[in-house]
Amino acid sequence: MIGTPYTEGARRAMLLGCGELGKEVAIELQRLGVEVIGVDRYANAPAMQVAHRSHVINMLDAKALRAIIELEKPHLVIPEIEAIATQTLVEMEAEGVNIIPTARATKLTMDREGIRRLAAETLGLPTSPYFFCDTETEFNQAIREIGVPCVVKPVMSSSGKGQSVIRDIAQSNKAWQYAQEGGRAGGGRVIVEGFVPFDYEITLLTVSAVNGIHFCAPIGHRQEDGDYRESWQPQAMSDEVLAKSQAIASKVVEALGGYGLFGVELFVKGNEVYFSEVSPRPHDTGLVTLISQDLSEFALHVRAILGLPIPNIHQHGPSASAVILAEGTSSNIRYQGIGAALEAVNTQLRLFAKPDIDGRRRLGVALARDIDIDSAISKALDSASKVKVIF
């Protein structure tokens, strides 16, 4: 049952994290009449602008997080970022609070160690070789054992912060320092992974719903500086590789438990598929689904967490997204060229309405459909290039 917002019978959902992905989740919740409460560490975050009300707290502060949940008494608590006091969510779930998809899934995926050990050691899924390191001495030993090239990531980071590829042993010290600076906790444990010389990488959006497990068409993407720049759907792949990918995604999602959409990241080399990471929430590369599917990843997530069925997912054809990236410092961001960006048929824009910028920041995304993937990517890139960010 869903009541009307602001009434006694309202269904209340609290978003922990109010960025561009949370904004789309908030919009989909509102389409189904859910009362939305946004929570983030800064004011006027994108999802706050479309929520019924919002709060600014440090979500890594266990007492502050518990206090806001106890104040609002939401029926659903939906983590949309990793930087949250997850142990508090575990405790509150045991007290009866509904954490999406589960508090365990949120805690396991908050850091790379929990999910990697689940995938490789508990589920026995194929992954790259890896070591976890607390000190620079352990780090250097791990590099010697794995060899170069190898990939270094903070155990806790997001959006590519602190990640680097070591191609020469002489880069080790710099990579260690960069990883320490990029971790969400201000330094600490890192993972050293063997470099998989993959042919391509995909995000397989996997939905756990009341009527079973569902898959979106695979999404290909290009990364730069640890963050995505373009994504496209569908990524061409053989039936054999797709079946392997779906089997891996199913095992991970079922092990994590709960209802919702999960972004499962996989490497593909030949006919082999390797597990990389998983997010128990919509994925940034999945922004392409705003134009590529009848139900976007955000609509699917909301249906699933509300316990609603998903009869089918229709994919419209070759589609792409291209990031609108800017660099500078301003709290008065404006945009020009929007008309030019929307001149081509089957193009759309999403401007995230972020309140400020200090450095490099993703401010929007261009979306396009065309006759084939290359044409869709080209159209999305062209559209994105026409949007001029004014400070």
Swiss-Prot record:
ATP binds at R112, K153, S158, S159, G160, K161, G162, Q163, E193, G194, F195, V196, E201. N(1)-(5-phospho-beta-D-ribosyl)glycinamide binds at E20, L21, E80, D284, K354, R361, R362. It catalyses: N(1)-(5-phospho-beta-D-ribosyl)glycinamide + formate + ATP = N(2)-formyl-N(1)-(5-phospho-beta-D-ribosyl)glycinamide + ADP + phosphate + H(+). InterPro entries: ATP-grasp, ATP-grasp_carboxylate-amine, ATP_grasp_subdomain_1, PreATP-grasp_dom_sf, PurT, PurT/PurK_preATP-grasp, PurT_C, Rudment_hybrid_motif. Pathway: Purine metabolism; IMP biosynthesis via de novo pathway; N(2)-formyl-N(1)-(5-phospho-D-ribosyl)glycinamide from N(1)-(5-phospho-D-ribosyl)glycinamide (formate route): step 1/1. Its EC number is 6.3.1.21. It comes from the Bacteria. GO terms for cellular component: cytosol. Involved in the de novo purine biosynthesis. Catalyzes the transfer of formate to 5-phospho-ribosyl-glycinamide (GAR), producing 5-phospho-ribosyl-N-formylglycinamide (FGAR). Formate is provided by PurU via hydrolysis of 10-formyl-tetrahydrofolate. Homodimer. Belongs to the PurK/PurT family. This is Formate-dependent phosphoribosylglycinamide formyltransferase. It comes from Shewanella sp. (strain W3-18-1).
